Design a protein with these regions (language model features):
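Active-site and adjacent substrate-binding regions of carbohydrate-active enzymes
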Residues: 1-168
Length: 168
């Protein structure tokens, strides 16, 4: 089980169930990928679309777990309440995933609150693939902060450690 991996998020929704609930599957999917892109008013997420198809209105989502949970937006806007809830959201998602049947896996950087790697847009060999947004090099400087009190990295590291201990 994992929240994020090296690839995009495909919104494989159970369309017959959605229809039985009176939900338009296409509109729901469009809302989800635009919300996690950050273009829906009130969205906390910062991500990008991948393989948007105008004809079918299909798209996938890209971004790191922390950025999709709102940490990046909170840091940019200096919004302390948003930062606090975004960190809780990130840890809650990992906690829920960790207690599903199976083996929980972290995407590289989830344990240190790794943000999107927007620098991929400056690399002509990588700019055409928005999946590179969450494929940036591991941030070793932030990894060292997991041992420093008061950092986001320590907060997440300790939170994930507690989840692991509960699971054991």
């Amino acid at each position: 089980n994992y929240l994020r991996c090296h690839d995009d998020i495909g919104w494989g929704l159970d369309e017959p169930v959605e229809e039985s609930l009176g939900i338009d599957p296409l509109k729901h999917k469009e809302f989800l990928y635009h919300f996690y892109e950050g273009s829906v008013p009130g969205s906390w997420a910062m991500g990008e679309l991948y393989n948007y198809d105008e004809a079918s209105k299909d798209a996938r989502s890209c971004g790191t777990t922390a950025s999709l949970c709102g940490v990046e937006r909170a840091l940019i806007t200096h919004d302390k309440p948003l930062l606090a809830i975004s960190m809780k959201r990130d840890l809650m998602m990992h906690s829920a995933m960790s207690f599903l049947r199976g083996f929980p896996m972290l995407s590289c950087g989830d344990e240190i609150v790794q943000l999107n790697g927007w620098e991929y847009k400056e690399d002509p060999d990588r700019v055409e693939d928005s999946r590179n947004l969450h494929r940036s090099p591991f941030n070793w400087e932030n990894a060292a902060k997991r041992k420093q009190a008061g950092t986001l990295q320590k907060q997440m590291w300790d939170g994930l450690k507690s989840v692991r201990e509960m699971r054991d």
